[in-house]
Amino acid sequence: MGTLFRRNVQNQKSDSDENNKGGSVHNKRESRNHIHHQQGLGHKRRRGISGSAKRNERGKDFDRKRDGNGRKRWRDSRRLIFILGAFLGVLLPFSFGAYHVHNSDSDLFDNFVNFDSLKVYLDDWKDVLPQGISSFIDDIQAGNYSTSSLDDLSENFAVGKQLLRDYNIEAKHPVVMVPGVISTGIESWGVIGDDECDSSAHFRKRLWGSFYMLRTMVMDKVCWLKHVMLDPETGLDPPNFTLRAAQGFESTDYFIAGYWIWNKVFQNLGVIGYEPNKMTSAAYDWRLAYLDLERRDRYFTKLKEQIELFHQLSGEKVCLIGHSMGSQIIFYFMKWVEAEGPLYGNGGRGWVNEHIDSFINAAGTLLGAPKAVPALISGEMKDTIQLNTLAMYGLEKFFSRIERVKMLQTWGGIPSMLPKGEEVIWGDMKSSSEDALNNNTDTYGNFIRFERNTSDAFNKNLTMKDAINMTLSISPEWLQRRVHEQYSFGYSKNEEELRKNELHHKHWSNPMEVPLPEAPHMKIYCIYGVNNPTERAYVYKEEDDSSALNLTIDYESKQPVFLTEGDGTVPLVAHSMCHKWAQGASPYNPAGINVTIVEMKHQPDRFDIRGGAKSAEHVDILGSAELNDYILKIASGNGDLVEPRQLSNLSQWVSQMPFPM
């Protein structure tokens, strides 16, 4: 104790001497507490002296926050900000809660807190508060959180309850939902494996679409890859490893716990009377090439029989809903089901018109997506596969680009997403339809460009057609063969070619090469998001290290990725075929099927990680109030209540595109 006392006295003396140099004289204190207090004051003054030197460097910005005595001004005090934060933290919950008070108690609540007066006070304090809080106050005063807005409809069951109240709608048409690429859970059904990987440990565990997937890819990467990769030669299951798509609504409602996909749609359909006897989720193994889905799983046969059963039991035609790649699957199915031949549907012409009431194309990729090209060239996945951020981070973090490329190349379903229509849709080196959007000095038709060439192998820029050809040329022979057997990415030059292409399955995923079915009573709804920057073109470089991946996006470039209008994944121009169909009867739409186009503006809620009820992002659109509203109206037989809306110039672009017919 004596030692501590002497040390403190010495510190006091030192502090006193230093303070005397600055012109301040302090009396000695006898109390130990006062000695500590004096020590603290001396420490603060030393900091003040040091701060004075820094103040000369910082200049007016530092002095502006202090008054003439060197103290912080009251408006910049942390204590003031804390008090204001606490004040707002108490009053704002009352403000939001007032909107949800029962009608019988609303007057009492309004008398308790006068929100008009609160807004006046908030106006007085807005200039003092941080920018984030000020923006929050602006949203409140603008009425962005009123009950009449769609934000309130982001809650569970909200859209269904509102439509039930306003229109008294009820379930009518059976509903079949076809999910998009990678959004269906994949689970292991194998029990053998090999010497390095015992498959029985993963029996009936989801190796895609669960936290178990994340744990396995981190803890046992080699085993996880052996399960999810397909056999390169056959495109089917590798020996001793068996994965299958999860079934039922659980297969697509959530990707990972907390990250919903179709759950909002299920909830709202349930409100108006839908249940498993009236709707189903047609989950599929999206890794497989389309005809391999039929060859291995009889997927299209099961889908046909499910639709026929629904039609027989209910007496109503079926409503098909496809999201993303699911829309391609539905378009393919409508050609498959009426085609004749082995592994085909053999339903005969007229089957679609007899069994299908409507086709809802929600953010569909009927003409592909540019992101599929860098996925197959250089394994880009973080921004290519729009799903749970944690899952995509795991794929980017724990797998090299070479590993990702090899995995993606075995998945025969991925090439189906390659863009279709060549220069008609995607432009050439001279121009593209989207160029006027941003007044580009360059053109989006220049899809892949090389700013730094290290060899003669890649010494020119590439259009979309050239880029796809290059992608295949640097791919393994077995991938080239599978793509040529399963898909086609061009366009038909005349009506005769359109009809001829209906005979072979490789054309059925491309609406530029085959017409819509003869189904005059079917209705098509194309609903997609706009106003969200979307990848459209890329700058690539050739790596010097031959042992590494040969081609990668050149992130050292000033602009490695060129963005355009879209929904964050699918660019606007990829919906061109909907507008071509909507022009009326033509070789592409021989029956004159009625096509309704609804463009949804992406207006995400800044306080909702999934964007809220007004989001039109590629995946989050499934939770938007507007899309759910349309789905329920169409499924209940009230599709006439869906009003077309075009916010972009795509219809004008399509009229100027060089379609051959």
Swiss-Prot record:
It is an enzyme of class 2 (transferase). The active site is at 324 (acyl-ester intermediate), 567 (charge relay system), 618 (charge relay system). It is a single-pass type II membrane protein. It catalyses: a glycerophospholipid + a 1,2-diacyl-sn-glycerol = a monoacylglycerophospholipid + a triacyl-sn-glycerol; a 1-acyl-sn-glycerol + a 1,2-diacyl-sn-glycero-3-phosphocholine = a 1-acyl-sn-glycero-3-phosphocholine + a 1,2-diacyl-sn-glycerol; 1,2-di-(9Z-octadecenoyl)-sn-glycero-3-phosphoethanolamine + 1,2-di-(9Z-octadecenoyl)-sn-glycerol = 1-(9Z-octadecenoyl)-sn-glycero-3-phosphoethanolamine + 1,2,3-tri-(9Z-octadecenoyl)-glycerol; 1,2-di-(9Z-octadecenoyl)-sn-glycerol + 1,2-di-(9Z-octadecenoyl)-sn-glycero-3-phosphocholine = 1,2,3-tri-(9Z-octadecenoyl)-glycerol + 1-(9Z-octadecenoyl)-sn-glycero-3-phosphocholine. A motif (Bipartite nuclear localization signal) lies at residues 43-50, 64-71. Glycans are attached at residues 453, 461, 469, 594. Coiled coil: none annotated. InterPro entries: AB_hydrolase_fold (IPR029058), LACT/PDAT_acylTrfase (IPR003386). GO terms for molecular function: O-acyltransferase activity; phospholipid:diacylglycerol acyltransferase activity. Residues 34-48 have a biased composition (Basic residues). Its main location: endoplasmic reticulum. Residues 1-71 are annotated as: Disordered. Belongs to the AB hydrolase superfamily. Lipase family. This is Phospholipid:diacylglycerol acyltransferase. It comes from Saccharomyces cerevisiae (strain ATCC 204508 / S288c) (Baker's yeast).
